[in-house]
Amino acid sequence: MIEIEKVCVDFTAGRGTPTRAVDNVSLHIAAGEIFGIVGTSGAGKSTLLRTLNALTRPSQGRVNVNGVEISALDGKALRQARQRIGMIFQHFNLMHTRTVAQNVAFSLKAAGWERSKIAPRVAEILTLVGLADKANRFPVQLSGGQKQRVGIARAIANHPDVLLCDEPTSALDLETSATILALLRQINAQLGITIVLITHEMNVIKSICDRVAVMSGGKVVESGEVFDVFAHPQHAFTQQLVSHTLNLTLPERLREHLPGQLLKILFIGDSAEQPVLSEVAIKFGVAVNILHGKIEYIGERALGILVVQLTAPHNPTAVAAAVEHIRQRTAQVEVIRG
């Protein structure tokens, strides 16, 4: 569906040395999936996203969308290709002197729709995004979440195959963000639109995306199924993002002064619902103290992470046996200290 092949993007200021914003990126995005690109500010993710509709041209490499090399198009051919690619933005980009309905209708007029078909399509799409009762309101009368819904309505009005989302929730509060992500999931499921979403928040990736690419310094440092990236992050930068998202850092006081062994245990799938720690307490006679932990559900799969303290002052070998038992029953055990 979308093929990004060895894409580089360089920017030059005056006569200075070019700055490479995107560095040799290759990605394949399947039709109908929700694909996330995550990274910190300056990672190159927005620049990469803009190559998908040729708002930014690659300095090297190529971008194919629906079998067409969009990076090689211009003029009428490019305008026609862009009609199949919708885009929403962090700050909405609405026309403030036009009503909600007029904002949506504008994209249809620009695409050459027959006048008689515009009003019914506007009504249909506003119903889909939950704004049927706001058609005659102006943007200044809307909340941030409602403004983003207008942006989404405008972006999908032309029946696009692809929807590009540039930090769609970063200007919204947590509750409103969740409703916007739910709407995007609904649109993906109901209309089959391929969604490519960029964000700096792993929580957004976790809640909506099927697969993810992690960017740092203009490069894709890791990619894969969202669950796998959370469960087994390979690159140090990804590990940092996941750790920050799961928030499992122990205070230094606990790390240094608690007796016994400290373990970080990863539970995946069914093991997250099994009484593994109760088993080791009973079988090996060790004291188990849960210091930190949570269970996340990514899609329908459970991912549990616990930080625990194991002690057995009168039987030191019992702790080693308990650790080995935990290793056999769980996905991963990291000895933090001990």
UniProtKB/Swiss-Prot annotation:
CDD domains per record: ABC_MetN_methionine_transporter (cd03258)
EC numbers on record: 7.4.2.11
GO molecular function, one term: ATP binding
Membrane topology: Peripheral membrane protein
Principal location: membrane
PROSITE patterns: ABC_TRANSPORTER_1 (PS00211), ABC_TRANSPORTER_2 (PS50893), METN (PS51264)
SUPFAM superfamilies: ACT-like (SSF55021), P-loop containing nucleoside triphosphate hydrolases (SSF52540)
Binding site for ATP: G39, T40, S41, G42, A43, G44, K45, S46
Class of the enzyme per the UniProt entry, highest EC level: translocase
Free-text function comment from the UniProt entry: Part of the ABC transporter complex MetNIQ involved in methionine import. Responsible for energy coupling to the transport system.
Record-given protein name: Methionine import ATP-binding protein MetN 2
Organism for this UniProt entry: Salmonella paratyphi A (strain ATCC 9150 / SARB42)
Taxonomic lineage from the root: Bacteria, Pseudomonadati, Pseudomonadota, Gammaproteobacteria, Enterobacterales
